[in-house]
């Protein structure tokens, strides 16, 4: 049997924005990874570490797995993870570097590691870090994720291809390291088709391009 912690009336208003954040973070990570998950490592930092995190953990697991399989929900998520031999590790830290609360996830799959963090800003979900790169990106309905070598010309070429396809950029958020790696999260108006993704993958210095929906 699964131990899903019930949400009482008093804590519901506190948990609601965090449940939304966890759902968005789970969908984000699940859409990025490409191979079977072996481990989901979740760290709650700051104020969120002191509240009832059981439903948040279930929400994260359910959202990650639901991008790859059907009929996953808050009730059965941890059971399914166990059946799939996915190890769930949770940890808690009282302090955060720059936010009141932060949730960090490290996904380990058969072929890759992907870590990212999120936080709430005025009740809305934001991605604040991807693979150690700081970024500030509000999660929206249709987005594009890019990973690339940080060289001149990439952003211009990307913008040109999107413009040619009549895809409008609403927001553009960039994260980068000092060692030549960069990621971006781009909010776009409307959905991006697979044909356009193939064109974007041919841009110089691209490592990965993913269309995201939330």
Task: Place the predicted regions along the sequence by residue.
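A conserved regulatory-domain signal marking ACT and ACT-like small-molecule sensing domains
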Residues: 1-214
């Amino acid at each position: 049997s699964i131990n899903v912690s019930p949400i009482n009336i008093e804590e519901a208003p506190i948990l609601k924005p965090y449940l939304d954040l966890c759902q968005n973070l789970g969908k984000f990570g699940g859409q990025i990874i490409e191979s079977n998950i072996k481990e989901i490592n979740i760290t709650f930092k700051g104020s969120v570490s002191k509240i009832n995190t059981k439903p948040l953990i279930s929400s994260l697991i359910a959202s990650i797995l639901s991008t790859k399989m059907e009929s996953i929900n808050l009730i059965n998520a941890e059971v399914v993870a166990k059946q799939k031999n996915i190890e769930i590790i949770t940890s808690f830290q009282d302090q955060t570097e720059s936010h009141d609360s932060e949730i960090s996830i490290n996904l380990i799959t058969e072929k890759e590691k992907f870590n990212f963090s999120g936080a709430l800003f005025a009740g809305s979900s934001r991605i604040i870090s991807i693979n150690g790169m700081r970024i500030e990106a509000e999660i929206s309905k249709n987005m594009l994720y890019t990973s690339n070598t940080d060289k001149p010309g990439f952003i211009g070429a990307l913008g040109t291809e999107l413009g040619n396809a009549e895809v409008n950029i609403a927001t553009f958020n960039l994260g980068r390291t000092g060692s030549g790696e960069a990621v971006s999260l781009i909010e776009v108006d409307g959905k991006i088709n697979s044909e356009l993704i193939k064109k974007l993958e041919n841009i110089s210095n691209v490592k990965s391009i993913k269309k995201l929906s939330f």
